């Protein structure tokens, strides 16, 4: 590895092939750039070979093409390979552009790279046009006539420009008498062929510049210090505190052995109803892979982040700025220490059992500046809004809000105190600390909190909450004593 990073030539190969940062969500869409490079190589080799035998003359063009097809070894293959690769070239170019549009490659910090790509496309179109109108038959003649006639649309001077390009009143010996091209290009026997070559080498140069500028800036790979996400985090955007609360409820930190080395993963798995929430989280973070699976016939959607660079650069700063309150923080501390220590072997990983010792007191939790935003995220994960009948044969409806967490007595008690609930925390059948409220005052308190919180519910829980408010308006016990908001 030392010679790869010290040798003047090998270190270039190493930087672009081995150490080059790439998106964690790589897909087949990232193949088009390399396929275009393959097409470019084929076009150069076949184009130079054909040019050796082609005569750019109205009288000799057909004979030279027949010579290529009949007399040159595998000339027919070279010609057809050149023409079909040209079509494939543009097909792949448009797919490559589509990939860039979909993943926002035109945005900062890749704006200049995108602009160079646009120039490459324009030069490619010009090169393809010049290759198309090389003298061979009627299509070349009228192709050149029609395209160059576009200049005639320029008011007053258009027709003069067309005749200047043609070198006369009509296209003949395709612009071989064009003084302008001869002066600019000094291209030898055929200005068109020479101009095509010049443009082709311009394309190669621009592609080299574009590749150099793209290094480290591929769509989906963003520097923490330059990304919008980083700026929002350092500016104190409480959306990230919301995410910490969400991950504390339903997320996990895992270190598992898959193959020879350890895999570090931050993940969250929710019901398919929350698929939009998963994609919103991915959009906020800008990283991660979304996957789907069935568990006992229940559709689930998950977001997983496994790239170590992303974990170090994006995830750890969030959880350092907004620490979790429950004992799941022990899982994070173990995860962080192992990740930063560079442990890759299971044998080097210390044994771990989550401690039962509380990390925080009730007072320290509720006095934390970001607790309200964190609580919205935690409600998104573990909260439940419901309306039910007190008795099956009775029409008397009860509205309830409940929230629970395993081994979370201190945390749930802090939520109880923060929201001024009077109901006691209890252990349910699954050994989770649970809080359930149904009183008018408690329902009013949770509504006021959510309406005035610094962040809003984002997922399916938001729909559940809105439906809950709609049902509350129909229950006189609550609607007569609570000012139920009309929107959220």
Curated annotation (Swiss-Prot):
Keywords: Endonuclease, Hydrolase, Intron homing, Mitochondrion, mRNA processing, mRNA splicing, Nuclease. Residues 170-488 are annotated as: cobA intron encoded. GO terms for molecular function: endonuclease activity. The keyword Membrane does not apply. Its cofactor is Mg(2+). GO terms for biological process: intron homing; mRNA processing; RNA splicing. Disulfide bonds: none annotated. It comes from the Eukaryota. InterPro entries: Cyt_b/b6_N, Cytb/b6-like_sf, Cytochrome_b_N_euk/bac, Di-haem_cyt_TM, Homing_endonucl, LAGLIDADG_dom. Its main location: mitochondrion. The keyword Nuclease applies. GO terms for cellular component: mitochondrion. The mature protein may arise from proteolytic cleavage of an in-frame translation of cobA exon 1 plus intron, containing the I-AniI open reading frame. Cleavage may take place close to Met-213 resulting in an active endonuclease/maturase of about 30 kDa. Its EC number is 3.1.-.-. It is an enzyme of class 3 (hydrolase). Residues 1-169 are annotated as: cobA exon 1 encoded. It is found in: Mitochondrion. Homodimer. Mitochondrial DNA endonuclease and mRNA maturase involved in intron homing and required for splicing of the cytochrome b (cobA) gene intron, containing its own coding sequence. The protein stimulates the intrinsic ribozyme activity of the intron through binding to and stabilizing specific secondary and tertiary structure elements in the RNA. As an endonuclease it introduces a specific double-strand break at the junction of the two exons the cobA gene and thus mediates the insertion of an intron, containing its own coding sequence (group I intron), into an intronless gene. In the C-terminal section; belongs to the LAGLIDADG endonuclease family. Residues 237 to 488 are sufficient for endonuclease, intron homing, and RNA maturase activity. PANTHER family: CYTOCHROME B. This is Intron-encoded DNA endonuclease I-AniI.
């Amino acid at each position: 590895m030392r010679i790869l990073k010290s040798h003047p030539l090998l270190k270039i190969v190493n930087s672009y092939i081995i150490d080059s940062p790439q998106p964690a969500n790589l897909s087949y869409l990232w193949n088009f750039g390399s396929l275009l490079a393959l097409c470019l190589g084929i076009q150069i080799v076949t184009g130079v070979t054909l040019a050796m035998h082609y005569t750019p003359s109205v009288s000799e063009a057909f004979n030279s093409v027949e010579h290529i097809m009949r007399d040159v070894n595998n000339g027919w293959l070279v010609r057809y390979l050149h023409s079909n690769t040209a079509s494939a070239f543009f097909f792949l170019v448009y797919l490559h552009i589509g990939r860039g549009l979909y993943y926002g490659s035109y945005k900062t910090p890749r704006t200049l790279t995108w602009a160079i790509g646009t120039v490459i496309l324009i030069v490619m179109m010009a090169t393809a046009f010049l290759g198309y109108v090389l003298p061979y038959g009627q299509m070349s003649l009228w192709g050149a006539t029609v395209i160059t006639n576009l200049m005639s649309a320029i008011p007053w001077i258009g027709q003069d420009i067309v005749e200047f390009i043609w070198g006369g009143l009509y296209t003949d010996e395709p612009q071989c008498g064009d003084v302008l091209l001869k002066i600019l290009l000094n291209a030898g026997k055929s200005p068109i062929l020479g101009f095509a070559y010049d443009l082709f080498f311009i394309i190669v140069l621009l592609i080299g510049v574009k590749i150099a500028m793209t290094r480290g800036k591929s769509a989906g790979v963003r520097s923490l210090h330059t990304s919008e996400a980083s700026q929002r985090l350092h500016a104190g955007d409480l959306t990230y505190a919301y995410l910490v609360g969400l991950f504390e409820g339903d997320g996990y930190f895992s270190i598992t052995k898959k193959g020879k080395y350890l895999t570090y993963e931050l993940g969250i798995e929710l019901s398919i109803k929350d698929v939009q929430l998963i994609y919103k989280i991915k959009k906020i973070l800008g990283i991660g892979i979304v996957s789907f699976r069935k568990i006992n016939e229940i559709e689930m959607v998950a977001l997983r982040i496994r790239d170590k660079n992303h974990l170090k650069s994006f995830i750890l700063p969030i959880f350092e700025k907004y620490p979790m309150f429950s004992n799941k923080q022990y899982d994070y501390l173990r995860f962080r220490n192992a990740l930063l220590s560079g442990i890759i072997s299971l044998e080097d990983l210390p044994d771990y059992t989550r401690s039962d010792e509380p990390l925080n007191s009730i007072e320290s939790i509720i006095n934390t500046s970001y607790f309200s935003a964190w609580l919205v995220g935690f409600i998104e994960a573990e909260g439940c809004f419901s309306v039910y009948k007190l008795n099956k044969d009775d029409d008397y409806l009860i509205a309830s809000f409940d929230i629970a967490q395993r081994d979370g007595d201190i945390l749930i008690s802090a939520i109880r105190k923060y929201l001024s609930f009077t109901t006691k925390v209890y252990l349910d059948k699954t050994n989770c600390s649970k809080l359930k409220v149904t009183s008018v005052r408690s329902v009013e308190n949770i509504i006021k909190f959510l309406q005035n919180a610094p962040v809003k519910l984002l997922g399916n829980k938001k729909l559940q909450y809105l439906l809950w408010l709609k049902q509350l308006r129909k229950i006189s016990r609550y609607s007569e004593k609570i000012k139920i908001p009309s929107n959220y």
